[in-house]
């Protein structure tokens, strides 16, 4: 996996883990798993539900759907500066003398 791919996956999975967000994980074969992300590494996600912890290989995952939105904060990356404000200036031509 490229470093760029990890820049998206790791903050997303880490936010799900830290905030204990319930997730639905859809596998490429259509099976739906539900639980909370307990841990993850480059190749697997540990998904915990009430009765068991499952090791799910990332190559088998199609989609991860959180039950609510999560705040993604990329580590080692400063927050974006506030967008600059655009001001529309109207110019009036003075009559020629």
Curated annotation (Swiss-Prot):
Cell membrane among keywords: no
Domain Sm: 10-70
Gene3D superfamilies for the chain: 2.30.30.100
PROSITE patterns (UniProt xref): SM (PS52002)
Disordered: region residues: 75-97
Matches recorded under Pfam families: Hfq
Comp. bias regions, Polar residues: 85-97
Gene Ontology biological process terms, A to Z: regulation of DNA-templated transcription; regulation of RNA stability; regulation of translation, ncRNA-mediated
GO cellular component term of the entry, any: cytosol
MF GO annotations: RNA binding
SUPFAM superfamilies given in the database record: Sm-like ribonucleoproteins
The entry's keywords: RNA-binding, Stress response
InterPro entries xref list: Hfq, LSM_dom_sf, Sm
Protein family membership: Belongs to the Hfq family.
Quaternary structure and interacting proteins, as annotated: Homohexamer.
Known role: RNA chaperone that binds small regulatory RNA (sRNAs) and mRNAs to facilitate mRNA translational regulation in response to envelope stress, environmental stress and changes in metabolite concentrations. Also binds with high specificity to tRNAs.
Annotated protein name in UniProt: RNA-binding protein Hfq
Organism: Neisseria meningitidis serogroup C / serotype 2a (strain ATCC 700532 / DSM 15464 / FAM18)
Gene name, Swiss-Prot/TrEMBL: hfq
């Amino acid at each position: 996996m490229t470093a760029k791919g990890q820049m998206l996956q790791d903050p997303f999975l880490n936010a799900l883990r830290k905030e204990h967000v319930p997730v639905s994980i859809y596998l490429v074969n259509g099976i739906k798993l539900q639980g909370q992300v307990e841990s993850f590494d480059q190749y697997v996600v540990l998904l915990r539900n009430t009765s068991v912890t499952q090791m799910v290989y990332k190559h088998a995952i199609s989609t991860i759907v959180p039950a609510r939105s999560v705040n993604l904060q990329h580590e080692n990356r400063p927050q974006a500066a506030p967008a600059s404000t655009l001001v529309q200036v109207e110019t009036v031509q003075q009559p020629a003398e």
